């Protein structure tokens, strides 16, 4: 059962109830707290575009706690983050794995963060296909091209050489927040806001 908390605010016109995500959106905060599929990507992209229309000069914060998911859905979010005018700050809470880690690294340089006990995991794209040999060959070429694209972007975002990215993403590569900072996936580990 998925319970979404409601927040009640007092206004000069009385009380107003929001689901917690709508209330956070008012403060330019977007939550990515699930696996990434087309529906999730469409929702995140719509929120990014809405916040750009509201104020193109004000930063957006994207909090990430995601095991990853669809490459094409994740790339829709990535491309939108790069396309819009506001800087998108990324913050890892819990786990940013696979496409979640990719989106974490996609935040504006200097504005990519992780909480101290969060984890980041990078790896090569996963895929599986069935069918005729020629179709399997087509899908194999496609996933290899995707791997090259993802590795190239990660190299640009982290400052790591492409060969190092290819080696480090060959298998599941788990990192603490501090290791992710050293690697260049994030810029800072947030200790406290107090």
From Swiss-Prot:
One Gene Ontology term, aspect cellular component: cytoplasm
Q: What is this protein identified as?
A: ATP-dependent Clp protease proteolytic subunit 1
State which Enzyme Commission number(s) the record gives.
3.4.21.92
Q: Which family does it belong to?
A: Belongs to the peptidase S14 family.
Q: Which UniProt keywords apply?
A: Cytoplasm, Hydrolase, Protease, Serine protease
Q: What domain of life does the UniProt record list for this protein's source?
A: Bacteria
- By its UniProt entry, which InterPro entries does this protein fall under? ClpP (IPR001907), ClpP/crotonase-like_dom_sf (IPR029045), ClpP/TepA (IPR023562), ClpP_His_AS (IPR033135), ClpP_Ser_AS (IPR018215)
Give me the gene this protein comes from. clpP1
State the organism named in the record. Halalkalibacterium halodurans (strain ATCC BAA-125 / DSM 18197 / FERM 7344 / JCM 9153 / C-125) (Bacillus halodurans)
Reactions mediated catalytically: Hydrolysis of proteins to small peptides in the presence of ATP and magnesium. alpha-casein is the usual test substrate. In the absence of ATP, only oligopeptides shorter than five residues are hydrolyzed (such as succinyl-Leu-Tyr-|-NHMec, and Leu-Tyr-Leu-|-Tyr-Trp, in which cleavage of the -Tyr-|-Leu- and -Tyr-|-Trp bonds also occurs)
Q: Which HAMAP family match?
A: ClpP
NCBIfam families noted in UniProt: clpP, PRK00277.1, PRK12553.1
Active site annotation, chain numbering: 98 (nucleophile), 123
The record's Pfam families line, in alphabetical order, gives: CLP_protease
Which molecular-function annotation in GO is an example for this chain? ATPase binding
Q: Does the keyword Endoplasmic reticulum apply?
A: no
User: Subunit structure, per the record?
Assistant: Fourteen ClpP subunits assemble into 2 heptameric rings which stack back to back to give a disk-like structure with a central cavity, resembling the structure of eukaryotic proteasomes.
CDD domains reported in the protein's UniProt record: S14_ClpP_2 (cd07017)
Localization of this protein = Cytoplasm
Q: Which PROSITE patterns match?
A: CLP_PROTEASE_HIS, CLP_PROTEASE_SER
Per the entry, what this protein does is: Cleaves peptides in various proteins in a process that requires ATP hydrolysis. Has a chymotrypsin-like activity. Plays a major role in the degradation of misfolded proteins. ClpXP1 is involved in the complete degradation of the Site-2 clipped anti-sigma-W factor RsiW. This results in the release of SigW and the transcription activation of the genes under the control of the sigma-W factor.
């Amino acid at each position: 059962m998925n319970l979404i908390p409601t927040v009640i605010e007092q206004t000069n016109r009385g009380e107003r109830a929001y689901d917690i995500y709508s209330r956070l959106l008012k403060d330019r905060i977007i939550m990515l707290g699930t696996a990434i599929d087309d529906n999730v990507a469409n929702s995140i992209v719509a929120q990014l575009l809405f916040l750009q229309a509201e104020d193109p000069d004000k930063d957006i914060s994207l909090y990430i706690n995601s095991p990853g998911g669809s490459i094409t859905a994740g790339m829709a979010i990535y491309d939108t983050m790069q396309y819009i005018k506001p800087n998108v700050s990324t913050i890892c809470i819990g786990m940013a794995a696979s496409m979640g880690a990719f989106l974490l690294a996609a935040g504006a340089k200097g504005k990519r963060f992780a909480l101290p006990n969060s984890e980041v995991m990078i790896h090569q794209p996963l895929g599986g296909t069935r069918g005729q040999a020629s179709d399997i060959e087509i899908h194999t070429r496609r996933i290899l091209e995707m791997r090259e694209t993802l590795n190239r972007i990660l190299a640009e975002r982290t400052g790591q050489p492409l060969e190092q990215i290819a080696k480090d993403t060959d298998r599941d590569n788990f990192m603490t927040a501090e290791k992710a900072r050293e690697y260049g996936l994030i810029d800072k580990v947030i200790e406290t806001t107090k």
